[in-house]
Amino acid sequence: FLLQDYAEKNPELVKRMIDEGHIVGNHSVHHYSMPTLGQAECESEIKDFHKYMEDNYDYTMTVFRPPMGEFSEFSLGVTANCGYETELWSFAYADWAVNNQPDEGQALEKLVNAAHPGAIYLLHSVSKTNTDILGDFIDRVRAGGFEFG
């Protein structure tokens, strides 16, 4: 799930995600709390990034993750009316503070222990810890009989 700013600053990575067949999800233009916005603002946060991805990558996004996981019945309705399915997560941890990163060993154990069929992990790209443990995490989860889809 990307913000528009990230897609604008990392075109090679976004193209690689698409070329490798990954689902690229919409996380909005500005990372505003969707329930605090009116209908036009909600639609703009979703549709403007949607148009950017179509115009710049010829890619149509279909899943949306509301910033901070904050949503309301109203914002879910707006999201659906924009043609999106809302997708949240089953696991998240405090990995977003670049100057307060979790311990690698503890983080790896948390992630591996949270594995279950259908698990959806929320891992932030700004996390050095996540970057450093990702290979080991993938190997251990696969060794536990799980697959990534």
Which sequence ranges carry the predicted segments?
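Active-site beta->alpha N-cap acidic-glycine motif
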Residues: 1-61, 147
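Solvent-exposed loop/turn segments at secondary-structure junctions
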Residues: 4-8, 23-24, 30-34, 59, ...
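Structural recognition of the beta-strand scaffold that forms the well-ordered cores
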Residues: 1-2, 23-28, 62-66, 85-89, ...
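His/Asp/Glu-enriched short active-site or ligand-binding loop at hydrolase and phosphoryl-transfer sites
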Residues: 70, 75-114, 146-149
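CE4/NodB-like, metal-dependent polysaccharide N-deacetylase domain
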Residues: 23, 39-72, 77-80, 107-123
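Generic structural signal for hydrophobic
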Residues: 14-17, 79, 114, 141
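C-terminal domain-boundary segment and adjacent tail
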Residues: 5-9, 129-149
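Aromatic/hydrophobic pocket-lining residues that form the small-molecule binding cavity
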Residues: 10, 42, 46, 104-107, ...
